[in-house]
């Protein structure tokens, strides 16, 4: 057992202030699934290099959105997988948001190509005519051109409702979506896409602005709170999300 533990890097829990104990239930769920985990700090990520991060982005977190932006803005930590979760003030797990990944704007084209190759999402573009969707108020022309150079056709949506309508007509291979759209967040768009059997497994990548004001981070946390459907997920429900993320 000790040997296996050494071979597997840890999952870190971030966004929780040490001493609060809000991570206790989450830790017990992870440990019951066979994962090694601990409460970590953002400043230790470069040296610690965890296998992945479970990040609290609720209104009760310790600047969860700020931590996410720091992780994804640094070349030394941006490729560490992050699973955002909603933890109540008492640490109950109310929601999990297993998006495929995050990119900060403006997206570096070489990094985009590398990450999509790691996810195995570029190979079939050489053989098949595949469509990707970019959902953003601005249209993200530079990103769209980079995706086209990887061999994908690009269709654009400017609101969440438009993206849902387009996805029902044109099945897409993957989606890039701004974190906040005029009518919904990227997480809400993903929740709605999962209700449609034709788009339930479509990878969705979230596009983060390169900086966020305090008010923006608070608004994002409150928006996530509206997506919470249960007071507490069971251990099996939570681990199911985590396994799909792997």
Name every feature range the model reports, one short phrase each.
Residues 147, 153-163, 176:
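Eukaryotic modular interaction domains in large regulatory/scaffold proteins
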Residues 1-51, 75, 108-141, 161, ...:
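Non-catalytic signal-transmission and effector/linker regions of two-component phosphorelay proteins
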Residues 15-17, 55, 86, 134-137, ...:
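Short beta-strand/turn micro-motifs composed of small residues
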Residues 50-52, 100, 172-174, 225:
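Conserved acidic residues
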Residues 31, 147-148:
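Alpha-helical segments within the soluble intracellular
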Residues 78-112:
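Helix-enriched interaction subdomains in cytosolic or periplasmic regions
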Residues 23, 41-90, 177-195, 200-201, ...:
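Conserved phosphotransfer microenvironments
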Residues 94-103, 186, 216-229:
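As written
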């Amino acid at each position: 057992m000790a040997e296996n533990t050494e071979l597997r890097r840890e999952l870190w829990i971030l966004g929780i202030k040490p001493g609060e104990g809000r991570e206790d239930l989450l830790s017990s769920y992870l440990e019951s699934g066979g994962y090694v985990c601990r409460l970590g700090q953002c400043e230790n990520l470069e040296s610690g290099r965890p296998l992945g991060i479970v990040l609290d982005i609720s209104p009760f977190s310790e600047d969860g959105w700020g931590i996410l932006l720091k992780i994804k803005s640094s070349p030394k930590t941006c490729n560490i997988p992050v699973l955002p979760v909603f933890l109540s003030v008492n640490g109950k797990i109310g929601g999990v948001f297993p998006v495929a990944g995050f990119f900060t704007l403006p997206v570096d084209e070489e990094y985009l190509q590398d990450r999509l190759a790691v996810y195995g999402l570029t190979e079939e573009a050489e053989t098949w005519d595949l469509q990707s969707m970019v959902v953003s108020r601005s249209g993200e022309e530079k990103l769209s051109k980079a995706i086209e150079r990887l061999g994908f056709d690009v269709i654009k949506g400017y609101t969440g409702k438009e993206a849902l309508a387009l996805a029902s007509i044109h099945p897409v291979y993957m989606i890039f979506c701004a974190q906040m759209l005029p009518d919904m967040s990227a997480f809400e768009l993903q929740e709605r896409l999962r209700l449609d059997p034709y788009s339930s497994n479509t990878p969705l990548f979230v596009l983060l602005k390169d900086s966020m004001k305090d008010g923006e981070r608070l608004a994002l946390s409150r928006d996530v709170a509206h997506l919470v459907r249960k007071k507490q997920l069971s251990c099996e429900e939570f681990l199911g999300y985590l396994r799909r993320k792997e």
